[in-house]
Amino acid sequence: MSSIVRAAISGFNETVGGIRAAQEKFKDTQEHFVSLMVFCDCEKRLVYDKVPVDKIPELTSKDYRPCCCTPLYDAMGISLSALRNDIKDKNDATAVVTIITDGLENASKEYRLKDVKALVEDLTNSEGWTFAYIGTNQDVDKVSEDLSIRNSMAFVDNEDGMSAAWNLESNSRMRHFEMMSADFCATQGMSSQERKLFRSRKNAETKYYDEDNENQNNNDKKA
């Protein structure tokens, strides 16, 4: 990601701004926290760990310095397992997980593909988590399918491509939060586990990256 680091940082900060807007818009039904793991062969580090969105400082080049190899499976396995353990006893807690990488897995030591795939499937089907995969310099559809991630997007490996990917991600996330707010009213009276299964079924039926809808919205703005 070193060639597009400026766009990656800017896009992340804009996405956090969108989550803040969602927090305000849906404050009666949602409370948002943000985690960010950066990873390479040198380190796998949580920059933010379940920080309330209104307390997230701006990400800078001091926080994010990509280099060397891509231990994708380790980064996913470590961060997802930790988050699952942290929120397992919190009623109605769920997660929207976006994975962004400019390269294929090539450096993991603790987790294998089958381990991460099983973890994603369990969190998706049993806990109602939402996963999205954004990548470049790879067959994104195949990689996401191998990981059992239903939502994926490829981007062009330059600043414009990275910016466009972040824009679609931010808009998709806001639509997802709107859906979650509507579902909150529809699931009153359900048990916590019933709500998780409801979210899982709804996620399976819904396109997270609805590019047709995105294009229509852009055309409406121009008109």
Where are these regions (language model features)?
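Acidic, low-complexity intrinsically disordered regions
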Residues: M1-A223
